[in-house]
Regions:
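N-terminal secretory signal peptides that target proteins for export/translocation
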Residues: 1-10
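Bacterial N-terminal signal peptides
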Residues: 15-27
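Aromatic (tryptophan-biased) beta-strands that constitute blades/sheets of beta-rich domains
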Residues: 32-63, 94-101, 135-140, 145-152, ...
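Repeat-blade elements of multi-bladed beta-propeller folds
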Residues: 35-38, 62-84, 103-136, 150-177, ...
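Short, positively charged, low-complexity/disordered linker segments
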Residues: 52-57, 322-350
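Structural recognition of the beta-propeller blade-terminating site
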Residues: 89, 140, 180, 220, ...
Length: 389
């Protein structure tokens, strides 16, 4: 897995990230309403994309990664190179703590009231070691102290997910794991065989996860038993969307799929111009981001409602509100907000540099946070000036 450190030249780093974007999607992925444990795609109402948003604060670092930060109602947990994680207050950017675990972080973290769950790895592919060593740990919310840690034969990839008292992750060893979130004890492991680089999504009694060999798997979230799988012709790296007993997802083969959540039978599929990076359900429609630089809107029955071209390829999940969706096009210098109704551009969030990361945008309260090559930017509505006396 590509990791980015401060000693890269700008040209070499951008080239590497561009190749990364064509082969790997790291989901945010985070459901930002009531459930923060699944795909990072839906922001709560305090974010109003119809009004101007300006930079409220910034955290500077040349060690950001292609991993989406974790968050809770108040705090952000930013992954950095060399196994480092920092905790920041969402409203002000104030540093709470910094934890240095060593090695490298291997998957996007996830947070709850206990703290933040972090996957890491030690050993490098070129070090001569036959196998890398993975680890999963819980860092406490207040001080970043390790509460528990479990070692794994191989590291977890993509993103972690919380659900029903368990933490889920897919590994580079082809296994899907479930751990008790309170103490880290293994609940089950399913050995699929092909590696994973995506984010599990928990819905009811099922957990869904896409594989590098093009299969979407549905497992019993309590036992890990495989319920069904659906095969496509491309890697599945984005998180699935679901509702009304239907699962929607995209594949590297360029198609958007809708399958029955109970048995995995195909209901419909629709072609885009390139590999599909993200599928998000919004009310009664689907937003689809493709590597052809277009954003598509489909009805839940598969009818295309509109498509809009963006100034670069999209390699991360969008951040969606009731009004609009924020996308981070590669090589552009601003996040782009499209109105959900007709796809027209309604806002821009200038970053001051080319976007060169697959980390997804997130929101904490009314603050929108964008990971850049040089740190974290926090956007919010301008503060109201006090009335003149």
């Amino acid at each position: 897995m590509l990791r980015l450190t401060r000693n890269w030249t700008r040209t070499a780093r951008f080239t590497a990230i561009w190749l990364f974007a064509l082969t790997t999607v790291l989901p945010l992925t985070f459901a930002q309403t009531i459930d923060k444990t699944n795909a990072h795609s839906t922001a709560s109402d305090p974010v109003d994309f119809s009004q101007p948003l300006t930079i409220r604060w910034r955290y500077e670092s040349n060690s950001t990664l292609n991993l989406t930060p974790a968050f809770d109602d108040e705090r952000i947990y930013l992954p950095l190179a060399s196994g480092t994680l920092v905790s920041l207050m969402g409203a002000s950017g104030q540093l709470n703590w910094r934890s240095e675990m060593g090695g490298e972080l291997s998957a996007s973290p996830v947070a709850d009231q206990r703290g933040v769950y972090v996957a890491s790895e030690t050993g490098k592919p070129d070090s001569g070691a036959r196998r890398a060593t993975g680890a999963l740990r819980l860092l406490g919310r207040e001080g970043g102290v390790t509460q528990w840690m479990r070692t794994l034969a191989m590291p977890l990839r993509g993103a972690l997910t919380l659900g029903n008292g368990k933490i889920f992750g897919g590994g580079s060893d082809g296994k899907i794991y479930a751990f008790d979130s309170a103490n880290g004890e293994a609940r089950w492991a399913y050995d699929y065989g092909a590696p994973f680089n995506s984010q599990p999504v928990v819905s009811g009694k099922h957990v869904y996860l896409g594989s590098e060999d093009g299969n979407l798997l549905a497992l019993d979230e309590e036992t890990g038993k495989l319920l069904w799988h659906y095969r496509t012709k491309g890697a599945i790296r984005g998180a699935v969307a679901n509702g009304n007993d239907i699962v929607y997802f995209g594949s590297g083969d360029g198609y958007v799929y809708a399958v029955n959540a109970t048995n995995g039978r195909l209901l419909w599929r629709k072609r885009t111009g390139a590999g599909v990076e993200a599928v998000v359900r919004t009310n009664e429609e689907l937003l689809v981001a493709s590597l052809d630089n277009f954003v598509y809107k489909f009805s839940l029955a598969g009818a295309r409602l509109w498509k809009r071209r963006l100034p670069g390829r999209i390699s991360s999940q969008p951040l969606v509100t009731q009004l609009g969706a924020l996308f981070m096009p590669f090589s552009s210098s601003a996040g782009v907000v499209l109105e959900l109704r007709d796809g027209r551009q309604i806002n821009l969030l200038p970053t001051g540099e080319e976007i060169a990361t697959s980390a997804a945008p997130i929101a904490v309260g009314a603050v929108v946070l964008l990971t850049t090559e040089h740190g974290l930017l926090a956007f919010a509505a301008p503060r109201e000036k006090p009335p003149l006396k």
